[in-house]
């Protein structure tokens, strides 16, 4: 087991303000050889007095990063992107052979096929991926311990994730800020993911309306799930899961007792 108690309570990718974070930079020229870095190289200030006022200047910043990432495939173990992720930058990031942790806040990256190159990846957050067309490439990441996918509007079936036998934490949710639900066919895939210790499932609609696969999560310690008529009917049975101790199911019974 990899996840610690703090990660089980709050989520592996929860941001604590008092914790040290990697340095945040914009341009390749600011890089000082760190293995962990935050790169915010898009959505740059385009005002008239900015060095990035032209589209060409802004594009050059992204191009330089793409070139650097491809030509230096062994430098990073952790990368965070808090500004818009375009497809070409996503593909370049997937050149990083030693990457163990990747956090993408949001972007337009419909093709994630190259992520299967990141065989050492353990922690993956793909935010606001409404254009993503397939999650099959993620199923190749056999060392994944924790996965968050947000707003994958085109994905109806999450069965490919059952290949991730080391996965302890799984978050599947829509756009919680809009808010906008995602719709998936079923959560039957959970019956083959009994190793999960953390499962969060918000702003999501299950077309089958069958939530009984939740009862197969015999190792679950944190369970946070959107209330619904079907979930509420199962609430007492869910509480009997042998290792359950965190999440809205435990901390917010009023959500499910309406």
Protein language model regions, located:
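Concave beta-strand-loop units of leucine-rich repeat
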Residues: 3-112, 120-189, 195-258
């Amino acid at each position: 087991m990899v996840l610690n108690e703090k990660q089980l309570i709050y989520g592996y990718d929860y941001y604590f303000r008092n914790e040290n974070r990697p340095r945040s930079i914009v341009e390749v020229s600011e890089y000082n050889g760190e293995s962990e870095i935050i790169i915010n190289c898009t959505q740059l200030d385009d005002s008239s007095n900015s060095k990035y006022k032209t589209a060409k200047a802004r594009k050059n910043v992204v191009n330089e990063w793409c070139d650097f990432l491809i030509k230096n495939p062994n430098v990073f173990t952790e990368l965070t992107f808090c500004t818009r992720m375009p497809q070409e930058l996503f593909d370049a990031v997937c050149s990083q052979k030693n990457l163990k942790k990747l956090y993408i806040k949001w972007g337009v990256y419909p093709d994630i096929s190259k992520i299967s190159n990141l065989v050492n990846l353990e922690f993956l957050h793909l935010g606001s991926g409404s254009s993503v067309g397939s999650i099959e490439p993620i199923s190749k990441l056999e060392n994944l311990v924790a996965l968050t996918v947000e707003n994958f509007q085109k994905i109806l079936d999450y069965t490919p994730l059952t290949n991730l036998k080391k996965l302890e934490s799984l978050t599947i949710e829509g756009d919680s800020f809009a808010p906008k639900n995602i719709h998936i066919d079923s959560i039957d895939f959970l019956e083959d993911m009994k190793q999960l210790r953390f499962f969060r499932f918000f702003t999501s609609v299950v077309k089958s309306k069958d939530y009984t696969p939740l009862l197969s999560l015999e190792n679950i310690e944190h369970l946070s799930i959107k209330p619904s008529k079907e979930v509420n009917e199962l609430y007492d049975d869910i509480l009997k899961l042998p290792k359950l101790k965190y999440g809205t199911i435990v901390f917010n019974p009023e959500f499910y007792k309406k």
